[in-house]
């Protein structure tokens, strides 16, 4: 069995192709089942988001798997194979798994380290399991990837380093340790930055959130809580006078915010260029230059963390390789267990003949304890077998164990390779 990745991503593929090559939620289940019917494809999981459409496959032959998966995508999306081939990326074996691990932690995302893709990957895995298109290999690969990604997020906290001016400003405010329950904030301007600030502000327990925009209806769209209010441009002075914290996300040709308009001790974040707030020395003012410097530092930290995570991915590849190698020992372990259970069943039959008056409860208790003895006796040998299966002389060691147990078999039998 071979691990194969077939994908289109934002890195290599133009938006015009990505828009066509996208599985909707409704199509996903049908596509999984149809893909599994294709020649050579034994297992499959489909990940389809706005930035990528990826097939994670287990195939019995790489060449055949590549051919049929490629044609499946071309037929499904009605894109000529020749055109699709310009952008399709194929990865095999370790490189397929490496890509999966990188995707899981966000190293292949537009925003390095973002965690949204982890939820999308988990959902893709669950959908494939429901469709019955996964098996032992993809189950292990995806469980390992999801566990790895969670551990990396917990260890490195890469998402604690924002990549937007809006979130950087909010986190700068967080560091001041203010009692938000007594603070009123104002967001001036509801363009992209202003909306982002509003989103993060509403996640915090501010006493009130005042939204001011030239088009009041845009502010009214955020009136989801009693503490949120919408204001027009003519209310600027009134809003500023009442705010403890001001986020100005509006582009103006001249200053519209002056110290005299603000409450004493007010904090101002001027988030756009040209600046909208007069740079008075009497103000506690954070401007785009201050925050951009902080943002660049965060971006550099994300890249540095990405490099450290990439090194840990190499360790995950070794773990998966060890697991794959141990697959060969599973049939032998099962045969040893089966042989022991056959002996137990034979002993039980003999016991019942010699002591026919045993009650059903007594028979069950004796059988239970006999199986317990078998499990205790086999526990350590099985652990040692798993260790031997990844050793330098694994073929010889396992053949010897099989011979000792009277199981004359060759390694590789029933492995599915």
Swiss-Prot record:
An example Pfam family from this entry, by short name, is GlutR_dimer
Which ranges does the record mark as transmembrane? none
Q: Which Gene3D superfamilies match?
A: Glutamyl-tRNA reductase, N-terminal domain, NAD(P)-binding Rossmann-like Domain
Top EC class, one word: oxidoreductase
Spell out the SUPFAM superfamilies in the cross-references: Glutamyl tRNA-reductase catalytic, N-terminal domain, Glutamyl tRNA-reductase dimerization domain, NAD(P)-binding Rossmann-fold domains
Chain residues that bind NADP(+): 189-194
The domain comment in this protein's record states: Possesses an unusual extended V-shaped dimeric structure with each monomer consisting of three distinct domains arranged along a curved 'spinal' alpha-helix. The N-terminal catalytic domain specifically recognizes the glutamate moiety of the substrate. The second domain is the NADPH-binding domain, and the third C-terminal domain is responsible for dimerization.
Q: Which family does it belong to?
A: Belongs to the glutamyl-tRNA reductase family.
Spell out the protein name for this chain: Glutamyl-tRNA reductase
Query: What does UniProt list as this organism's lineage?
Result: Bacteria, Bacillati, Bacillota, Bacilli, Lactobacillales
């Amino acid at each position: 069995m071979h691990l194969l990745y077939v994908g289109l991503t934002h890195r290599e593929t133009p938006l015009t192709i990505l828009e066509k090559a996208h599985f909707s939620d409704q199509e996903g289940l049908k596509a999984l089942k149809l893909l599994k019917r294709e020649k050579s494809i034994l297992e499959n999981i489909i990940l389809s988001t706005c930035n990528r459409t990826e097939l994670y496959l287990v195939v019995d032959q790489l060449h055949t798997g590549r051919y049929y998966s490629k044609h499946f995508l071309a037929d499904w999306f009605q894109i000529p194979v020749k055109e699709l081939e310009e952008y399709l990326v194929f990865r095999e074996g370790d490189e397929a798994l490496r890509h999966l691990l990188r995707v899981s932690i966000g190293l292949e995302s537009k925003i390095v380290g973002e965690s949204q893709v982890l939820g999308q990957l988990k959902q893709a895995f669950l959908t494939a399991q429901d469709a019955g298109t996964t098996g032992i290999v993809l189950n292990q690969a995806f469980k390992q990837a999801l566990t790895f990604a969670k551990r990396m997020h917990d260890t490195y906290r890469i998402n604690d380093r924002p990549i937007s001016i809006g979130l950087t400003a909010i986190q700068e405010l967080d560091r001041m340790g203010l009692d938000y329950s007594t603070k009123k904030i104002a967001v001036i301007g509801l363009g992209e930055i202003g909306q982002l600030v509003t989103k993060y502000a509403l996640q915090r327990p501010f006493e009130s959130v005042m939204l001011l925009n030239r088009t009041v209806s845009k502010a009214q769209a955020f009136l989801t809580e009693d503490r949120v209010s919408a204001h027009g441009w003519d209310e600027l002075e009134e809003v500023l006078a009442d705010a403890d914290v001001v986020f100005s996300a509006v582009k103006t040709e001249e200053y519209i915010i002056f110290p005299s308009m603000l409450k004493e001790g007010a904090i101002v974040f001027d988030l756009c260029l040209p600046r909208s707030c007069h740079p008075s020395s009497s103000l506690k003012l954070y401007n785009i230059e201050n925050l951009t410097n902080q943002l660049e530092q965060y971006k550099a930290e994300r890249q540095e963390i990405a490099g450290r995570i990439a090194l840990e991915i190499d360790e995950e590849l070794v773990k998966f390789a060890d697991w794959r190698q141990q697959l060969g020992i599973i049939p032998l372990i099962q045969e040893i267990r089966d042989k022991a259970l056959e002996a137990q069943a034979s002993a039980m039959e003999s016991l019942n003949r010699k002591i026919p008056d045993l009650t059903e409860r007594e028979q069950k208790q004796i059988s239970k304890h006999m199986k317990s003895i078998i499990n205790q006796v086999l526990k350590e040998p099985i652990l040692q077998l798993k260790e031997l299966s990844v050793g330098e002389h694994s073929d010889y060691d396992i053949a010897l164990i099989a011979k000792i147990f009277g199981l004359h078999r060759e390694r590789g039998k029933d492995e599915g390779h």
